[in-house]
């Protein structure tokens, strides 16, 4: 009797344990994935990052940290359709209306993931973010993301900014390993209260260790360099100020202008890759249709050239390894078609960009980046421009406040071009401002916005009489007349025989550092630390009675 009773008790325990096992999440631990290589792009021109496979796609770590001009918005060609994400290499589909957790063991950074990545134009995905927000995130991952119905979703975790920053600082040749946990369940649980998918009565939990090696680092360098180009009605370009990156050039039968437009550094561990392509693309569709493919060409050395024609012509990663620059050639017909299309007074960063395509990763292999250097393209007939005398788009200064401290001085070159000299030329300074006792001051602020400090500002120029003329210019957007400046005149003649003049002068914008008013904030409080401000200087020219 005692033996039978013991046997019945044992059977009862076995049945109980079997019942509990059948009601638990099923856990699958896969073999470690083979190490894969990636290429990291640090874009200093647009302040974002891009990561893309250097070899095979899976396990995935691919995509940009920010949307670019290639973002799909519901119409047109589909290029960039999500931000960057990771997975365990199995690209496992998710069930609609289930909940999903993803967390990392040995995570490279704290808070590495922001939520469930999806394709932005699929039903149930946010077109603006390509992200399904979880109920909660923590130092290891995210929990309780509701899988929306509609388009397919996969076990993909969107990478956070801190994840990209970790990849940025990794040395070329370095590797990182992490164990990815991905779990989905039909049970509706409250992740914000601490519940997790792996603890539910049913579901599927997958575990896999992945390793990624940084095979290359491509850094796109923003030089802030500016060059002026004036074009006549025939499209013939004339170089203005800051022309060190450009030269007149003839390629075959086409004459025009070639300019160094991208500066980069590329470090690698010997990676060989031909699936990564770069090429330029014209942003204006009408202009792109009007010009021929050889009217805009690009080169890695300024000697051998490829035409710009969609994705047909490109340079590969392997070809980029032998260079550090990208050059663009613009034919006279390119500029002529700009005039015909009514495109003038434009910065090349608004005219074209460079595209990056990795054919290995079709959904997240598209990326776009701006040029390192900029051309300001102006019509030679009736135009005005202003450019820093350092030929940079973003001149900066810093200094200390107090008696005897030197002013922050910014020098500019103003150019007008037309059939005659301009009848009126005006200049103004825009920026944060504060009026005190009837006078406008430029307003500098601390990073947290608590300290706001007034600074006087001045514009000064040399007049035709040789005297120095000074204007109070406290960032108040008030136009000041500079028509009587001392202009250096250069005559020009078009191929058609039309004549005109190009006039240049210099102007200085100064912010004194020794004015007593800047020792206190606008609330009349003392301050200590750093304050900053940014603004713009605008010019305007008027021609009258022109035939």
Q: Which residues does each PLM region occupy?
A:
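N-terminal small/polar-rich segments of proteins
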Residues: 23-93, 155-157, 161-286, 326-462, ...
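Outer membrane beta-barrel transmembrane domains
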Residues: 447, 452-493
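Bacterial N-terminal signal peptides
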Residues: 8-16
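Long, charge-dense tracts
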Residues: 296-319
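Post-signal peptide N-terminal segment of secreted/secretory-pathway proteins
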Residues: 69-171
């Amino acid at each position: 009797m005692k033996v039978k009773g013991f046997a019945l008790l044992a059977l009862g325990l076995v049945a109980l344990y079997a019942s509990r096992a059948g009601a638990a999440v099923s856990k699958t631990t896969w073999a470690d994935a083979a190490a894969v290589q990636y290429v990291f792009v640090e874009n200093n021109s647009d302040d974002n990052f891009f990561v893309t496979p250097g070899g095979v796609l899976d396990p995935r770590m691919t995509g940009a940290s920010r949307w670019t001009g290639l973002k799909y918005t519901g119409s047109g060609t589909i290029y960039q359709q999500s931000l960057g994400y990771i997975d365990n290499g199995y690209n496992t589909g998710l069930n609609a209306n289930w909940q999903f957790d993803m967390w990392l063991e040995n995570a490279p950074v704290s808070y590495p993931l922001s939520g469930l990545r999806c394709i932005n134009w699929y039903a149930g995905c946010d077109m603006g973010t390509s992200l399904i927000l979880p109920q909660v995130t923590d130092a290891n991952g995210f929990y309780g993301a509701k899988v929306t119905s509609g388009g397919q979703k996969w076990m993909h975790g969107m990478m956070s900014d801190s994840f990209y920053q970790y990849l940025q600082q990794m040395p070329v040749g370095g590797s990182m390993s992490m164990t990815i946990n991905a779990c989905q369940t039909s049970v509706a649980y409250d992740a914000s209260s601490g519940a997790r998918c792996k603890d539910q009565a049913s579901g599927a939990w997958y575990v896999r260790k992945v390793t990624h090696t940084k095979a290359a680092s491509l850094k796109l360098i923003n030089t802030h360099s500016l060059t002026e180009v004036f074009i006549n009605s025939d499209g013939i370009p004339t170089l203005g100020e800051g022309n060190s990156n450009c030269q007149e050039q003839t390629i075959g039968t086409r004459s025009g202008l070639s300019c160094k437009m991208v500066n980069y550094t590329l470090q690698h561990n010997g990676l060989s890759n031909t699936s990564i392509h770069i090429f330029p693309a014209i942003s204006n569709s009408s202009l792109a249709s009007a010009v021929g493919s050889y009217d805009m060409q690009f080169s890695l050395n300024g000697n051998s050239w490829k035409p710009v024609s969609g994705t047909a012509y490109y340079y590969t990663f392997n070809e980029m390894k032998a260079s550090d620059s990208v050059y663009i050639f613009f034919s006279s017909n390119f500029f002529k078609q700009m005039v015909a299309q009514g495109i003038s007074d434009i910065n090349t960063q608004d005219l074209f960009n460079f595209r990056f395509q990795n054919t290995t990763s079709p959904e997240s292999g598209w990326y776009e980046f701006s040029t390192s250097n900029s051309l300001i393209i102006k019509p030679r007939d009736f135009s005005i421009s202003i450019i820093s005398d350092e030929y940079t788009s973003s001149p900066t200064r810093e200094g200390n406040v107090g008696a005897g401290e030197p002013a922050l001085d910014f020098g500019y070159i103003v150019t007008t071009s037309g059939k005659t000299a301009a009848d009126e030329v005006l200049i103004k300074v825009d920026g944060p401002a504060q009026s005190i006792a009837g006078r406008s001051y430029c307003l500098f602020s601390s990073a947290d916005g608590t300290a706001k400090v007034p600074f006087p500002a001045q514009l000064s120029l040399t007049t035709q009489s040789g005297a120095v003329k000074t204007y109070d210019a406290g960032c108040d957007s008030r136009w000041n007349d500079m028509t009587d400046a001392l202009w250096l005149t250069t005559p020009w003649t078009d191929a058609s025989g039309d004549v005109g003049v190009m006039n240049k002068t210099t102007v200085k914008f100064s912010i004194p550092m020794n004015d007593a008013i800047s020792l206190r904030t606008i609330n009349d409080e003392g301050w200590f630390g750093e304050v900053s401000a940014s603004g713009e200087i605008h010019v305007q020219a008027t021609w009258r009675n022109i035939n």
